[in-house]
Amino acid sequence: MSEKSVLEKLQETNRDAEIWWDSSPLVFKNWAKNVVDRAPAEKKEVWKRQLGRLFDPENPGATQFKGVTTNPPLSLAAVKDNPGFWGDYIKNLIRENPGKGVEDVFWMAYKEIVKRGAQLFMPV
C-alpha cells in the first residue's frame, strides 16, 4: 500500500499545481488531530505522517501547501477553534481601547487572526 496521500499523488501529475489550505492556518493543527483521532486504528500513523507532509508549522516551506485563503467566516472558525484564547484577546482589546466601538474591535481582532495565520505560512 502506498503511503502517499491523494493530494501527493495529484501533485505528481502536475508539479506546477498549487495545493491551498482553504481555511485559517490557525485551525490546521486541531483539524489534523481530529482527523487522526477519528481514523481507523490501522491508518492513524499513516494519516498522521501524510498530514504532517501536507503542512508542518515547524517547516512550512517544505510542506505541500502553497497558499491559504482567509475571510471573516474562516477567521471566525479560528476563533471557535480556540475560544478561550480569542475571548481573552478580545476582552483585552476592549479594555485597551475604551473609545473603540464594536466594528473597530472586530477589525482589530480580525487583522490579528489573519496576521497570526500568515505568520505560520511566511516561508511559503
Q: Which residues make up each language-model segment?
A:
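A residue-identity detector for tryptophan
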Residues: 20-21, 31, 47, 86, ...
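Flexible loop/turn segments at secondary-structure boundaries
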Residues: 27-30, 76-78
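Intrinsically disordered regions, especially transient/low-confidence alpha-helical propensity segments
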Residues: 17-18, 28, 44, 83, ...
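Amphipathic alpha-helical interaction segments
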Residues: 28-29, 39, 94
